[in-house]
């Protein structure tokens, strides 16, 4: 299994244009801290899939890894989504799905973006 969480954090937090649009580094894995429950815009992300891939002689040669990155805002999410996309593509991910959603109960706009990559295992 390959852990790409540090790479995703680095890609998102390291993109100055994204941080500027957010008004700070309001990017969290899974849950938003209670102190920031009303902070918008914000981004959350999580790893969805991390599977063995590319078998050579019955041994996995790589890992296929999927992440979902969610943009949350009280207004349009397009500009933030564009910056997330650039950050993730810059980190070697390909977007395979994107959806514009609206959370009726909270009146929050939500852009759900899904990315995948395949990385080879390092030889020991």
Language model segments and positions:
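Small/polar-rich, solvent-exposed N-terminal microdomains that initiate assembly or binding
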Residues: 1-55
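Hydrophobic side chains in well-ordered alpha-helices
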Residues: 8, 80-83
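Short, cysteine-centered beta-strand-loop-beta hairpins and adjacent loop/turn segments enriched
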Residues: 52-53, 75, 122-123
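Short, solvent-exposed beta-strand/turn "edge" segments of beta-rich domains on protein surfaces
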Residues: 56-60
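Oligomerization/assembly interface segments of phage tail-like spikes and tubes
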Residues: 61-75, 109-119
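Acidic-leaning, charged glycine-interspersed low-complexity segments
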Residues: 82-124
């Amino acid at each position: 299994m390959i852990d790409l969480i540090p790479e995703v954090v680095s890609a998102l937090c390291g993109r100055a244009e994204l941080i500027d649009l957010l008004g700070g580094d309001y990017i969290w894995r899974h849950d938003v801290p209670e102190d920031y429950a009303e902070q918008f815009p914000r981004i959350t992300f999580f790893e969805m899939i991390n599977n063995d891939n590319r078998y050579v002689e019955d041994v996995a040669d790589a890992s296929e890894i999927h992440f979902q990155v969610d943009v949350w805002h009280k207004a349009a999410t397009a500009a933030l989504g564009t910056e997330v996309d650039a950050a993730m593509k810059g980190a070697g991910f390909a977007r395979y799905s994107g959806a514009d959603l609206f959370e009726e109960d909270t009146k929050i706009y939500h852009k759900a973006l899904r990315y995948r990559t395949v990385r080879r295992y390092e030889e020991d």
